[in-house]
Swiss-Prot record:
Protein name as catalogued: tRNA uridine(34) hydroxylase
Residues the record marks as active site: 185
GO molecular function, one term: oxidoreductase activity, acting on paired donors, with incorporation or reduction of molecular oxygen
Cited PROSITE patterns: RHODANESE_3 (PS50206)
Gene name of this polypeptide: trhO
Alphabetized NCBIfam families for the sequence: PRK00142.1-2
Keyword Protease: no
Gene Ontology BP terms: tRNA modification
Family: Belongs to the TrhO family.
Catalytic activity: uridine(34) in tRNA + AH2 + O2 = 5-hydroxyuridine(34) in tRNA + A + H2O
Pfam families linked: Rhodanese (PF00581), Rhodanese_C (PF12368), UPF0176_N (PF17773)
Function: Catalyzes oxygen-dependent 5-hydroxyuridine (ho5U) modification at position 34 in tRNAs.
Length: 296
């Protein structure tokens, strides 16, 4: 019986020959039988792949045979069976596209100058100790935060990761420079960079949630400071940490709570938006708010 699994991981470490690592990763993934997205750069590797549990384990074993990746923090989750339509392995200038390659220095120890890493338990201790002085700062895009976020979190106005530099330089968050900022994202990689960019701009007390929302959910589920669902970058689109998770997202058609994203039916758009199963099943127009007047 097939048991589908998905793994998420990243490693910041200098790679002298990203093209060679790309070819090795392509061969390893194909040989193991996994699909997903793998990004390689001079800064390291960032990947989300899935498949049958035996295939995924074979991939992880092969990955850790390469010394720079042997200590990769592998985050496991349940898959649905066909979570990735294909395998993509690419070389890019940055592991995460902040458009700031010259502002980031990576050594064999990771990203230099980033925020202090905190485990989920240490985050709770910080909140207990400093109360309202602690501010959660979302390192994801607005779309992702619609269905789930930390309670009271600041969610920057971003459509892509490239928008963060513009947002930070706008001065809109300067009033938080004396706060204890806890940055968070899905698995932790975006906050490795974002926390450093914040510190470079005068934010003095910056932290990052080690392992991201995924590790927090494993530790506390829906019993802690997290509310809602977690947006994920595969065919599932979202995952929950318990059956009692409360959805924060709202269907654009009827306003009911839903974590369900669909693509706009307008072929010139295809933007993701929230639409519940009832509205989709009832044949309601599955177009985003911007495209409702546009014929599909």
């Amino acid at each position: 019986m097939s048991v589908p699994k998905i793994v998420l991981f990243y490693v910041f470490t200098p790679l002298a020959d990203p093209e060679a690592v790309k070819l090795w990763q392509l061969n390893l993934a194909q040989r193991s039988g996994v699909k997903g997205r793998i990004i390689v750069s001079e800064q390291g590797i960032n990947a989300t792949v899935g498949g049958d549990i035996h295939d995924v384990k074979a991939y992880v074993r092969g990955l850790k045979e390469y010394a720079p990746f042997q200590h990769a923090d592998i985050k496991w989750s349940d898959g649905a069976g066909d979570d990735f339509p294909r395998l993509s392995v690419k070389v890019r200038p940055e592991l995460v596209t902040f458009d700031a390659p010259d502002l980031i220095r990576v050594t064999e120890h990771g990203v230099e100058g980033g925020g202090t890493h905190l485990t989920p338990h240490e985050v709770h201790e910080l909140v207990e100790r400093r109360g309202e002085d602690v501010v959660f700062f979302d390192g994801r895009n607005q779309l992702e935060a619609e269905i789930g976020r930390f309670r009271g979190a600041v969610v920057p106005r971003t459509e892509t990761t490239r928008d963060f530099l513009r947002e930070l330089d706008s001065g809109a968050y300067d009033h938080l420079k004396d706060k204890a900022l806890v940055t968070y994202c899905t698995g932790g990689i975006r906050c490795e960079v974002l926390s450093g960019l914040l510190r470079n701009r005068g934010f003095r007390d910056v932290y990052q949630l080690d392992g991201g929302i995924v590790r927090y959910g494993e530790a506390y589920g829906d019993r802690g400071l997290w509310d809602g669902s977690l947006y994920v970058f595969d065919e599932r689109r979202h995952m929950e940490f318990s059956l009692s998770a409360r959805s924060l997202g709202r269907c654009v058609q009827c306003g009911e709570a839903t974590p369900r994203y669909v693509n706009c039916a307008n072929q010139q758009c295809r933007r993701l938006f929230l639409c519940c199963e009832t509205c989709t099943g009832a044949g309601a127009r599955t177009r985003c708010a911007d495209c409702v007047p546009v014929a599909a």
